[in-house]
Amino acid sequence: FGESCIAGRFIVPLGQQVTDQRDCALYKCVNYNKKFALETKRCATVNLKSGCKTVPGGAGAAFPSCCPMVTCK
């Protein structure tokens, strides 16, 4: 695959990033101390406080717009 990283069903070229809309994640292939590394960003896990609820992110939206949001009264 040349200079790239593999993230599940994605091949990410070195220095580029790919959004996984199905799993709401962002993958970036970087050169870290002469080794390829895959940086992965996903939605944060939240603990809801009283009076708060989660609102789903945009269906099919790119990361981070696909992440759920917390709204409180």
Curated annotation (Swiss-Prot):
Contains 4 disulfide bonds. Pfam families: SVWC (PF15430). One of its GO terms (cellular component) is extracellular region. InterPro entries: SVWC_dom. The keyword Acyltransferase does not apply. Expressed by the venom gland. Keywords: Amidation, Disulfide bond, Secreted. The keyword Disulfide bond applies. It is found in: Secreted. The modification Lysine amide is found at K73. Belongs to the scorpion La1-like peptide family. Not toxic to insect. Is the most abundant peptide of the venom. This is Venom peptide La1. It comes from Liocheles australasiae.
